[in-house]
Curated annotation (Swiss-Prot):
GO molecular function, one term: NADH:ubiquinone reductase (non-electrogenic) activity
Keyword terms of this UniProt record: 4Fe-4S, Cell membrane, Iron, Iron-sulfur, Membrane, Metal-binding, NAD, Quinone, Repeat, Translocase, Ubiquinone
Gene behind the chain: nuoI2
Protein name per the record: NADH-quinone oxidoreductase subunit I 2
Lineage, top ranks: Bacteria, Bacillati, Actinomycetota, Actinomycetes, Kitasatosporales
Residues in 4Fe-4S ferredoxin-type domain copies: 42-71, 91-120
Binding locations of [4Fe-4S] cluster 2: 61, 100, 103, 106
Length: 197
């Protein structure tokens, strides 16, 4: 059956007439800030202490908007006769948010939890060069990162944690033998007499 000419127009007018009498729901932004979900993708924050300069984030970034510079530093041996170690030291960590497409791959591949999503999204600039945030600016965004959500009280404990807890309880039980004394009724105390019952 062919559609009746003008039926689309009638449907559109019907929707308009139905919603015309309802109360408006205009958000008064920026006076009223929106309620953002905890995992909102805003700006990326850097927790510099966790960064080991492994370069995974820069290599996996599809936009190549992460710039990292580092140098190697020799750390003396911790014990006499030990070997000196070399480690990477972070010189520059920058993200160009003019290029970033907010895919989150850099955050997912970071094995040391050095990058986090912040819900902040109001960082517009008048000059495009100011959208390249250096490590000091990225560190400032860490203050806006929300705490991780609480665990569900009804959730099962992870297998590894349950096994570790069971082993710790077993070890504590072995290290704490029952000692007879006046605190335990019916058992002999230090004088050899039976305790009160």
């Amino acid at each position: 059956m062919a559609p009746v000419p003008g039926s689309g127009l009638a449907k559109g007018l019907a929707v308009t007439l139905r919603t015309m009498t309802r109360k408006t729901v205009t958000e008064q932004y920026p006076d009223a800030q929106p309620e953002l979900p905890p995992r909102t993708r805003g700006v990326i924050g850097l927790f510099e202490e966790n960064c080991t300069v492994c370069m995974l984030c820069a290599r996996e970034c599809p936009d190549w908007c992460i710039y990292i510079d580092s140098h190697k530093e020799t750390v003396p041996a911790a014990t006499p006769g030990g070997r000196d170690r070399s480690r990477n030291v972070l010189d520059r960590f920058a993200i160009d948010f003019a290029l970033c497409m907010y895919c989150g791959i850099c955050i997912e591949v970071c094995p040391f939890d050095a990058l986090f999503w912040s819900p902040e999204f109001e960082y517009a600039e008048t000059d495009i060069r100011d959208l390249t945030h250096e490590r000091d600016k990225l560190r400032e965004w860490m203050w806006t990162v929300p705490a991780p959500p609480a665990l569900d009280p009804g959730a099962e404990e992870p297998k590894e944690l349950a096994a570790a807890r069971k082993a710790a309880d077993k070890l504590a039980a072995q290290q704490q033998p029952d000692q007879p004394g006046p605190d335990h009724p019916g058992q002999p105390d230090e004088s050899g007499q039976e305790g009160r019952t």
